[in-house]
């Protein structure tokens, strides 16, 4: 199956006179199932709709919007696989030097706040065209939200973008329903009933009777306590079974969030990943320059989506939901055989997983009938008694992949949830993970070691991680392997004081670890942690918490994790002095730094 058209010449070659949809994306067009643009476009194609891709249009050029003419049914707009502001800026708000989703890594080929800019330009050239926005940037900004880069609460992106309809979450079924209704003759303004969408109205009579009324934009913009309360209502209404419609007044309009789209069945997941992807970047874009984002995912396999891990700093609950959706073994093997047939395949499957590699089934049987629990998490602070812990099916897939002709090694790199591994009374998965699926080092995410901070993060306590580490190295010894463990660590998370950061530094000292990279907490839209950062409250309890907000303190906490780096000496010295931890300044084996000369 050829690539979808990215210019007028290709549109003509595809015998398209007037496309049903023009898909505007902030990414370079890669026809691979790891890219939402490719999935949605191929789904539409499967159901008989024509789609042309307008990849990274230059908003300064008026003519770019006329490349395919105006679409018959509507414009589809996303910023790409990543929020455009996260894509462009570090947590320190410095401009990044490269863009992995752009040919040649060139930064600036998409604008800041890409969806807003794209839609405003489309509205200028096609005032009556239907505009539908989706993807991560739209999904996580679907209602009023704290924006770290402006340091203020912004309105729903459907207001600022002038879009007609917003698709949130994973939109395969939603976009087909929208397309079918538009094709039947309904106007975009009629589509106020579709699950997994957000719409706006000035007509109070259109608001569903069952809708929960949220505090207004003006109120949450000025009152942090109200902001936290509003966020928790949103957070607890992400489930397709238990979730209610939400209504947020925004000045002279109302923003309505319809209930979430139901999770895909296994058969539906297979249909998505069996679509005829080319599995690489469009050749015209490759001529301009390599798209680095393809490197890791080209020979990787996604087997699931959704996550019930409940990490506070993660947006998965708000975007993909807590119900695990997974593919069948047959579907995974079919994709593996496609990868093996790639002339550039060297025998190594880079990854087999998803948001959490070893979540292959829903957390419990009741989720599919009654929905997820709104008043508790599956794993934190302790695992629910109804949690099903079973790696059997995932392990069966890995074993089958290992035996395929042409495969030398199958790696698992996409976030093994170590607590779930430890809760499994059967060691087969852990043993085979260590024996066959680690590429020299296993990356896991304890994130911190202070239990106070871990509770705010929604992560298991340090004691469980210590048990995991011990067992990991024992298995390596039993298997006569010398493999390492790389812990992901986060500095400056809400609730983390200098004393907590020092506890983490002491742990790093004690295990002899020298981290090359540190993730400073990044307040991205629609997470619990970002709400903590903005409000100074834990929205689950409404109790005040300490927030390391100044760039200087964040730099000190980050430096403590890398205290061995001579460049960090002054910051580490200042942090230890502020915390009165002079016992860690000296020449003893427990000291972090030497005294100043």
List each language-model region with its residue ranges:
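Terminal amphipathic helices with adjacent charged low-complexity linkers/tails
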Residues: 60, 189-238, 252, 261-264, ...
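Conserved SAM/AdoMet-binding glycine-rich loop
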Residues: 23, 39, 54, 58-59, ...
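Conserved, mostly hydrophobic/aromatic
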Residues: 164, 272, 311, 332, ...
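Radical SAM enzyme core and accessory elements
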Residues: 2-6, 221-261, 268, 274, ...
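Flexible glycine/acidic-rich beta-alpha junction loops that bind and position SAM and/or redox cofactors
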Residues: 83-92, 140-142, 172-177, 202-205, ...
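Cysteine-centered iron-sulfur cluster-binding motifs in ferredoxin-type domains/subunits
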Residues: 300-313, 322-326, 331, 335, ...
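Glycine-rich beta-alpha loop elements in corrinoid/cobalamin-binding modules
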Residues: 36, 55-250, 561
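N-terminal pre-triad scaffold of radical SAM enzymes
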Residues: 24-27, 288-315, 348
């Amino acid at each position: 199956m050829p690539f979808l058209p990215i210019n007028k010449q290709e549109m003509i070659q595809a015998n398209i006179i007037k496309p049903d949809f023009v898909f505007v994306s902030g990414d370079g067009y890669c026809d691979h199932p790891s890219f939402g643009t490719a999935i949605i476009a191929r789904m539409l194609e499967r159901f008989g709709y024509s789609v042309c891709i307008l990849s990274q249009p230059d908003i300064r050029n008026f003519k770019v919007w006329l490349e395919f003419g105006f679409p018959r049914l509507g414009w589809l707009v996303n910023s790409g696989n990543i929020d455009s502001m996260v894509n462009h800026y570090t947590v320190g708000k410095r401009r990044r030097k490269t863009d992995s989703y752009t040919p040649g890594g060139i930064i600036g080929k998409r604008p800041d706040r890409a969806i807003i800019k794209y839609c405003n330009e489309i509205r200028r050239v096609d005032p009556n065209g239907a505009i539908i926005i989706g993807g991560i940037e739209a999904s996580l900004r679907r209602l009023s939200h704290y924006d770290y880069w402006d340091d203020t609460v912004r309105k729903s992106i459907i207001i600022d973008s002038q879009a007609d309809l917003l698709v949130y979450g994973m939109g395969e079924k939603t976009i087909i329903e929208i397309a079918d209704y538009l094709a039947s003759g309904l106007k975009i303004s009629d589509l106020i009933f579709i699950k997994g969408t957000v719409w706006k109205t000035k007509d109070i009579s259109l608001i569903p009777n069952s809708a929960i009324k949220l505090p207004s934009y003006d109120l949450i913009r000025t009152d942090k306590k109200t902001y936290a309360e509003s966020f928790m209502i949103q957070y607890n209404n992400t489930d397709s079974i238990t979730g209610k419609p939400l209504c947020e007044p925004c000045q002279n309009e109302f923003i309505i969030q319809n209930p979430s789209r139901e999770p895909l069945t296994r058969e539906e997941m297979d249909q998505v990943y069996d679509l005829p992807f080319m599995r690489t970047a469009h050749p015209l874009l490759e001529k301009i320059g390599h798209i680095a984002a393809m490197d890791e995912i080209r020979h990787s396999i996604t087997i699931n989506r959704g996550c019930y891990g409940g990490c506070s700093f993660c947006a998965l609950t708000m975007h993909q939901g807590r119900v695990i959706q997974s593919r069948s073994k047959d579907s995974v093997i079919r994709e593996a055989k496609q990868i093996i047939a790639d002339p550039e395949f060297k025998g190594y499957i880079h990854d087999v997983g998803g948001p959490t590699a070893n979540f292959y089934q829903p957390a419990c049987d009741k989720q599919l009938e009654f929905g997820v629990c709104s008043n508790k998490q599956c794993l934190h602070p302790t695992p629910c008694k109804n949690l099903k812990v079973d790696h059997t099916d995932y392990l069966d897939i890995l074993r089958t992949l290992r035996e395929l002709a042409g495969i030398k090694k199958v790696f698992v790199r996409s976030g093994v949830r170590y607590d779930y591994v430890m809760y499994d009374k059967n060691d087969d998965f852990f043993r085979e993970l260590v024996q066959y699926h680690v590429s020299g080092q296993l990356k896991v995410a304890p994130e911190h070691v202070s239990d106070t901070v871990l509770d705010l993060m929604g992560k298991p306590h340090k004691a469980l991680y210590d048990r995991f580490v011990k067992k990991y190295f024992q298995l390596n010894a039993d298997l006569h392997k010398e493999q390492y463990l790389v812990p992901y660590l986060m500095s400056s998370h809400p609730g983390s004081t200098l004393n907590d950061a020092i506890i983490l530094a002491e742990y790093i000292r004690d295990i002899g670890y020298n981290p090359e990279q540190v993730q400073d907490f990044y307040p991205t839209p629609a997470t619990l942690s970002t709400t903590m950062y903005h409000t100074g409250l834990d929205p689950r309890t409404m109790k005040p918490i300490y927030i390391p907000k100044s760039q200087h303190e964040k730099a000190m906490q980050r430096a403590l994790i890398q205290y061995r780096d001579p460049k960090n000496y002054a910051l580490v010295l200042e942090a230890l002095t502020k915390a009165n931890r002079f016992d860690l300044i000296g020449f003893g084996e427990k000291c972090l730094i030497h005294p100043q000369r």
